[in-house]
């Protein structure tokens, strides 16, 4: 009996132990679950989250500027992209470099359409002008800093500045051609010059000035030369009439006003006529065009002494005269003929 009582007395103790043990185990499991949840929350807090104001490949300098750089995935090297005034400009520079390296697979700060990516790859200078289609915020554009647009994107001005009309040549440039002296084997196209559209407003004044200047530089035509042989002015008192012959060949041009001019040909210009060159007589005719024409009879009273001396000289004397003989005191004192070293003479 005693044994049975002792056994019955021991049973509730065992059950209590078992209950207590179960309770302890249950408490330990709950404690383990609470510890795991708390540690998981701590780990989540420690993980770095993307800040809303930061961009990929952009760092802020202590003095306020933003630096952009990118890492090449093939060579594992960092490429410096430059420093910018704002973070948006640096982010745009990073996106341009990333798209050029990786194409559409690149991670960018902004979202781009395929057309934008193609435009950036073909012309990187236009990258700052592209607006992100999925973001209406205009702050992504570097519109607040025009210095960036000028320094890093030189083509910005070509697309946004109004095109100025091309300047035409001023109308006062071409009249300088009227002061050119005639060159042999070269015809002067005065008619084309007078009909140019740039000189349509000043044709009247230019034609008059051209007539006066060309009358000085050019000689007469062959017909007018034959008519003026008898009224040659001062040349009758110095040169015999047989020497005053028209040039064999001449090229004529006409201007807008209708006046004709001749350009002497160099083939026979150097052939002497009795010691005198052909250019001497042409220069004499050019000088007499701007003066009044006087006949030889009008000057007969002035050249009586020289006419007697010229009549006594024969044709052979003129043919044998040297250019040095013409610079004698009797002729040089008249003040019209000056001898050159080359044998050509000019009248002042």
Swiss-Prot record:
Where in or outside the cell it occurs: the entry states:
Nucleus
Q: Name one GO biological process term.
A: bract development
One GO CC annotation, please? nucleus
Q: Which PANTHER family match?
A: AP2 DOMAIN CLASS TRANSCRIPTION FACTOR (PTHR31677), ETHYLENE-RESPONSIVE TRANSCRIPTION FACTOR ERF086 (PTHR31677:SF49)
Phenotype reported upon loss of the gene = Disturbed cell division patterns in lateral root primordia leading to the expansion of the proximal region of lateral roots. Short lateral roots in young seedlings. In the shoot, formation of small pin-shaped protrusions at the base of pedicels.
Which SMART domains does the UniProt record give? Answer: AP2
- Designated gene of the protein: ERF086
Q: What protein name does the entry list?
A: Ethylene-responsive transcription factor ERF086
Q: Which organism is it from?
A: Arabidopsis thaliana (Mouse-ear cress)
């Amino acid at each position: 009996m005693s044994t049975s009582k002792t056994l019955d007395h021991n049973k509730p103790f065992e059950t209590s132990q078992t209950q207590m043990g179960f309770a302890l185990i249950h408490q330990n499991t709950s404690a383990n679950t609470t510890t795991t949840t708390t540690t998981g929350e701590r780990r989540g807090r420690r993980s770095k989250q993307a800040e809303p104001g930061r961009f990929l490949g952009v760092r802020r300098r202590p003095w306020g500027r933003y630096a952009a750089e990118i890492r090449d995935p093939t060579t594992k090297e960092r490429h410096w992209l430059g420093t910018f005034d704002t973070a948006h400009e640096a982010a745009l520079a990073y996106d341009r470099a990333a798209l050029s390296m990786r194409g559409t697979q690149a991670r960018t700060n902004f979202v781009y359409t395929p057309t934008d990516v193609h435009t950036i790859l073909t012309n990187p200078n236009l990258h700052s002008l592209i607006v992100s289609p999925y973001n209406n915020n205009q702050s992504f554009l570097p519109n607040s800093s025009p210095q960036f647009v000028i320094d890093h994107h030189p083509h910005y001005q070509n697309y946004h500045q109004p095109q100025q009309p091309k300047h035409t040549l001023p109308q006062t440039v071409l009249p300088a051609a009227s002061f050119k002296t005639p060159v042999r084997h070269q015809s002067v196209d005065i008619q084309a010059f007078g009909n140019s559209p740039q000189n349509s407003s000043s044709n009247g004044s230019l034609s008059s000035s051209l007539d006066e200047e060309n009358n000085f530089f050019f000689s007469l035509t062959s017909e007018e030369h034959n008519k003026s042989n008898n009224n040659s002015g001062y040349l009758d008192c110095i040169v015999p009439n047989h020497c005053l012959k028209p040039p064999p060949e001449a090229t004529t041009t006409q201007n807008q006003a209708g006046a004709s001019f001749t350009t002497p040909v160099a083939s026979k210009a150097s052939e002497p006529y009795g010691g005198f060159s052909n250019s001497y007589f042409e220069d004499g005719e050019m000088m007499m065009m701007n003066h009044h024409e006087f006949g030889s009879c009008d000057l007969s009273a002035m050249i009586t002494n020289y006419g007697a001396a010229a009549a006594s000289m024969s044709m052979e004397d003129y043919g044998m005269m040297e250019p040095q003989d013409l610079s004698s005191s009797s002729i040089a004192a008249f003040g019209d003929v000056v001898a050159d070293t080359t044998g050509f003479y000019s009248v002042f």
